[in-house]
């Protein structure tokens, strides 16, 4: 199993932006923005959500939203506001919003087959 990273540019509500190297995690629901980046972008918490980790433990994190530009497209997405030690993750909600999938063998982002149903 390989690890895939992609670089993206996040823009906050005040127009500040930051370039982030995301680990593409097809097992993560939401995209996670590291603590220092969320502070730089002035991202404000909109709600708190409980997340279950791979080991079964549950943590709570604040969720916000911001604009994300990837080489494959751009748009708004919900993001988890990370805490110290949290790594930048690109989750499946963002991938679906952008109409992308992680190719399991090539380890690349590719357009997904979109359904209108």
Language model feature labels by segment:
Residues 1-117:
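Pepsin/retropepsin-fold aspartyl endopeptidases
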